[in-house]
């Protein structure tokens, strides 16, 4: 079987499938996985508790969040727990790739998927290297604009935001590690601007609907606007990141007898917060369980469990919140909303948004409890 895309979703799925005795080919267009990273890499507490993450691939824990209004009025939130850790994603990808290789996964870098054909239940993949490969099953982990999804005639993402960020060393921010989130409809229409600072590494970024702003220009303006909040005078930019983030929720039709989708290709991102790493890990683990059973039994009924309809029910409120967020383009309305959140009775709502443990439905944990893999 073949997985297209070696981001977090593809790597997680591959390293769970190979130990089941399956012959797994992992294909990615990049030469090395520490190149052209797209995600900020913020892991939430539930992921850190439920999955065995290599500690040396994670930054220091974060339990403080500051939410800023358009006028930079702030709301401070503090959790009793270590809520977030920023992944060193290049290092994490390479570590997970080593797990895959040690488990027998075949690795094909610097290669793009072009198309496939089906004949008598067998798939033939055409790759950019000019070669063709026969495979039993195809998994698309190839991002928000998935070519695999299109060719499998599965559902495609229709709504996304775009994010752009700078990764810095040497930024100075007073106090403990924290996430700073900025509501500003000009710099981040429909989403937020952010500073993720763990005391070692700093991510400064903006996100929003691509038709409403220029991410590069917005990022530069945001950097100048926060000069009184974070000292960047001696900061060294070590990396820039950018990418599409699907925000339409988990897609309904994400599997058939030929292949299935995981990660961003499946829309496995929170519609409200645009956080995708926890859904990615859980959906990939579930996919590995379903594919293993399907290929061992040949029973297509097994695939019915892998339906986006089951997951979307959990996200109804977040889908509505996403629609509301997409329409909030007046700074005055956002300023009023932030003022309300600063009231004690409503600050609990903000606390729940940032620190709540909601993720994919519990059915995923019951059907596919993630296997711990030693690091």
Say what each PLM segment does.
Residues 60-61, 66-151, 159-161:
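Conserved N-terminal helical subregion
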Residues 113-115, 210-291:
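FAD/FMN-dependent oxidoreductases across multiple families
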Residues 289-375:
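C-terminal helical "tail/cap" subdomain of flavin- and related membrane-associated enzymes
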């Amino acid at each position: 079987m073949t997985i297209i895309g070696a981001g977090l979703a593809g790597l997680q799925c591959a390293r769970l499938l190979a130990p089941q005795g399956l012959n797994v080919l992992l294909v990615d267009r990049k030469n090395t996985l520490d190149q052209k990273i797209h995600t900020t890499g913020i892991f939430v507490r539930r992921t850190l508790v439920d999955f065995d993450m290599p500690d040396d691939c994670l930054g220091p824990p974060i339990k403080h969040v500051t939410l800023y209004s358009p006028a930079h009025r702030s709301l401070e939130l503090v959790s009793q727990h270590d809520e977030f850790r920023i992944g060193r994603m290049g290092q994490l990808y390479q570590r997970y790739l080593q797990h895959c290789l040690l488990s027998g996964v075949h690795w094909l870098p610097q290669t793009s998927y072009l198309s496939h054909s089906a004949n008598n239940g067998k798939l033939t993949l055409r790759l950019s290297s000019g070669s063709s490969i026969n495979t039993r099953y195809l998994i698309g982990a190839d991002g928000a604009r998935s070519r695999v999804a299109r060719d499998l005639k599965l559902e495609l993402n229709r709504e996304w935001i775009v994010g752009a960020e700078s990764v810095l060393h040497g930024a100075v921010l007073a106090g403990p590690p924290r996430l700073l989130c900025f509501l500003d409809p000009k710099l981040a229409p429909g989403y937020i601007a952010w500073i993720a600072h763990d005391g070692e590494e700093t991510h400064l970024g903006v996100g929003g609907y691509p038709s409403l702003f220029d991410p590069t220009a917005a990022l530069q303006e945001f950097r100048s606007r926060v000069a009184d909040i974070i000292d960047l005078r001696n900061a060294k930019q070590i990396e820039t990141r950018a990418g599409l983030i699907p925000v339409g929720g988990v897609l309904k039709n994400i599997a058939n007898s030929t292949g299935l989708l995981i990660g961003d290709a499946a829309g496995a991102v929170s519609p409200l917060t645009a956080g995708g790493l926890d859904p990615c890990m859980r959906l990939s683990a579930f996919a590995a369980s379903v594919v293993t059973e399907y290929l061992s039994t040949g029973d297509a009924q097994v695939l019915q469990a892998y339906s986006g309809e089951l997951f979307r029910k959990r996200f109804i409120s977040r889908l509505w919140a996403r629609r509301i967020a997409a329409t909030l383009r007046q700074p005055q309305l956002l300023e009023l909303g932030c003022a309300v959140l600063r009231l004690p009775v409503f600050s609990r709502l903000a606390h729940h948004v940032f620190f709540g443990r909601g993720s994919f439905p519990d059915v995923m944990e019951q059907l596919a409890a993630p296997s711990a893999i030693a690091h």
